[in-house]
A protein has these predicted regions:
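Active-site helix of classical SDR
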Residues: 82, 118
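A glycine-rich helix->loop->beta "capping" turn
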Residues: 36-49, 55
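Conserved Rossmann-fold cofactor-binding substructure of NAD(P)-dependent oxidoreductases
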Residues: 25-40
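C-terminal beta-strand-loop-alpha-helix "lid" module of Rossmann-like NAD(P)-dependent dehydrogenases
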Residues: 132-181
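Residue(s) in the substrate-gating loop at a strand-loop-helix junction
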Residues: 102
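Substrate-binding pocket helix/loop in short-chain dehydrogenase/reductase
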Residues: 58-59, 66-68
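Rossmann-fold cofactor-recognition segment
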Residues: 15-28
Length: 238
């Protein structure tokens, strides 16, 4: 098993995992990393696209450059990795691509609009990809976590522009997100769901048990009005 990090000096020691330095934002870095794995193993059976960035801020407060940076990692990073790996999967006529999305990919929240937009893009890309590659014995699937006690949410950057009219609601949502992350389960449940998505029977979408599974079901089966009201109440905006 191989993992990738932008800085090998910061890679954790994990038994059975060999880390390779790579940056999903850099086409050359991605190609070099994938080719180094192929040289050692001759194949790649499973690709998990888990790199991601989050940002808190109103849509109006977010510059095009900030949005582009988020899309570069969250969406184009998946595209770069997928394009690098697919030729080898097609050659072996088998493989599984697991793209880590988010509940926000189906249930967008205020002040996380650009992040939600990237995850909606991941959802659409993954469904289209799955249709295209199944003829080669390859399937693409999505994992949709909710809040998880990791640094992604806790250390999410804020949009640099601040518009006074959004201050109150933005601060309320920021505190709500921080509280939810503090009380959220650790990453183990998400990791288990990723393993199931990678090696279990194929499903287009997999959500960890608990809040993530509940929220995706609410979005799917309840009318938009009650879901909207419930979301605003949860974030402290009602």
């Amino acid at each position: 098993m191989f993992g990738t990090v932008r800085d090998l000096h910061k890679a954790p020691a994990l038994p059975g995992v060999e880390f390779i330095e790579m940056d999903v934002r850099d086409e050359v870095s991605v190609q070099v990393a994938v080719e180094s794995i192929i040289e050692k193993t001759m194949r790649i059976d499973v690709l998990v696209n888990n790199a991601g960035m989050m940002m808190i801020g109103a849509v109006e407060e977010t510059t095009a450059a900030e949005a582009a940076a988020l899309f570069d990692t969250n969406v184009l990073g998946i595209l770069r990795m997928t394009r690098a790996v697919l030729p080898y999967m097609r050659a072996h006529r088998r493989g599984r691509i697991v793209n880590v999305s988010s509940v926000l990919g189906v249930l967008p929240a205020p002040y996380m609009g650009i992040y939600a937009a990237t995850k909606h893009a991941v959802e659409g890309l993954s469904e289209s990809l799955d249709h295209e590659v199944r003829q080669f014995g390859i399937r693409a699937t999505l994992v949709q976590p909710a809040y998880t006690r990791t640094n992604l949410d806790a250390n999410a950057p804020r949009a640099e522009t601040r518009i006074e009219g959004y201050d109150h609601e933005r601060d309320v949502v920021t505190r709500s997100v921080a509280d939810s992350v503090r009380n959220a389960p650790g990453p183990r449940a998400v990791a288990s769901t990723i393993v199931e998505a990678a090696f279990g029977p194929w499903r287009m979408r997999c959500a960890p048990a608990g809040q993530a599974s509940l929220l995706t079901k609410l979005r799917r089966f309840l009318p938009a009005g009650p879901v909207d009201a419930s979301l605003r109440k949860k974030l402290g905006l009602a």
